[in-house]
């Protein structure tokens, strides 16, 4: 399960930390990613330490950049030094992956690549994901995550380019039952 401040607002929740605690009751010991919402080194470090203290199964989501476009690499380095489970999010380019891999290579961090948004830009996200997965798997013990899926078939794309994790909306997950239908049968259901 992954959660961020924009999903928090979209779902109408009132208190981010209370909502995170509520989610932890349902997820038990499964991996959960909660994102910091600060936009400075100090805020991110403070929030990451607090979020990770809520449970051992939490991966703290750190965006690859601050809102001003500057790298959060120093934040990532600090949190790796303090053994915080990390999910580096909002990745779009191979250059971004190459920049963080030396710091993350010996961790079990998650690298969240926004494949759906890459597609939205007119670039073939399958090719980009495959190349980024080659970088990740070739020089680290990190896991890759296909984020921001746009269609059910993204699940197949994620498998075919060797992605470890995919996040999908509930609507997309329920549509996966259609994978078992022949196209003829599917057309009759339309």
Feature locations, PLM:
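Active-site beta->alpha loop and helix N-cap motifs at the rims of alpha/beta catalytic domains
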Residues: 2-82, 115-118
């Amino acid at each position: 399960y992954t959660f961020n401040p924009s999903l928090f607002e979209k779902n109408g929740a009132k208190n981010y930390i209370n909502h995170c605690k509520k989610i932890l009751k349902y997820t038990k010991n499964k991996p959960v990613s909660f994102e910091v919402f600060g936009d400075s080194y100090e805020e991110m470090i403070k929030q990451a330490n607090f979020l990770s203290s809520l449970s051992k199964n939490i991966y703290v989501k750190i965006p690859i950049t601050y809102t001003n476009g500057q790298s959060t690499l120093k934040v990532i380095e600090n949190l790796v030094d303090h053994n915080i489970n990390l999910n580096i999010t909002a990745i779009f380019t191979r250059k971004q992956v190459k920049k963080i891999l030396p710091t993350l290579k010996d961790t079990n961090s998650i690298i969240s690549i926004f494949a759906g948004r890459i597609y939205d830009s007119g670039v073939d996200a399958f090719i980009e994901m495959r190349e980024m997965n080659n970088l990740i798997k070739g020089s680290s013990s990190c896991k890759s995550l296909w984020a921001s899926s746009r269609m059910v078939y993204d699940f197949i794309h994620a498998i075919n380019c060797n992605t470890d994790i995919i996040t999908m909306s509930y609507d997309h997950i329920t549509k996966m039952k259609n994978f078992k239908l022949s196209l003829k049968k599917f057309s009759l259901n339309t």
